[in-house]
């Protein structure tokens, strides 16, 4: 495990996070219309409830704070966060086949945990992440190269999700 891997893990866990609301819609036209409404004073929360196709829509677009280093969130979203100010509405952001609108709802959350205090933990987490990545690579490779007969439904579902194969 490299020092940079440990530092990256530290950034993911303890790095700057941004409290946000999001709206996810299926088209640029709708995203543009919604952005205009929001910039005209419409409530982000009410608009998210009305239009968002994301599961957060029911909560007015409220999601857990987004860490700018967390790869769970697409880089297109993470890259915008440091450039927005509180209550500012982002321009529509394309993520896969959907459009996302973001509003920063509060000041960035900055951890006061020193790296040195958690370095052993970062080593362990980094090692686990690397092992998981390598196991997923191996699993995908084996699935592609070999025909398997699997009798356990849980294993079938897990492997199907790895291979993106609906069979």
Residue ranges with predicted function:
Residues 11-14, 21, 67-86, 167:
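Cell-wall glycan
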Residues 15-20, 29-31, 58-60, 88, ...:
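Extracytoplasmic
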Residues 153-167:
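Gram-negative outer-membrane assembly/targeting C-terminal domains
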């Amino acid at each position: 495990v490299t020092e940079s891997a440990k530092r990256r893990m530290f950034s993911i866990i303890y790095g700057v996070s941004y409290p946000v609301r999001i709206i996810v819609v299926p088209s640029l036209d709708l995203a543009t219309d919604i952005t205009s409404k929001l910039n005209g004073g419409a409530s982000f929360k009410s608009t998210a409830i009305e239009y968002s196709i994301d599961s957060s829509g029911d909560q007015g677009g409220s999601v857990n704070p987004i860490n700018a280093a967390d790869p769970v969130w697409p880089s297109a979203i993470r890259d915008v966060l440091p450039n927005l100010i509180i209550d500012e509405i982002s321009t529509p952001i394309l993520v896969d086949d959907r459009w996302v609108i973001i509003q920063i709802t509060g000041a960035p959350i900055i951890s006061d945990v020193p790296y040195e205090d958690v370095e052993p933990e970062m080593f362990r987490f980094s090692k686990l992440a690397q092992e998981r990545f390598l196991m997923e690579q191996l699993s995908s490779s084996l699935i592609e190269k070999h025909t398997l007969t699997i009798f356990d439904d849980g294993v079938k579902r897990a492997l199907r999700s790895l291979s993106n194969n609906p069979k």
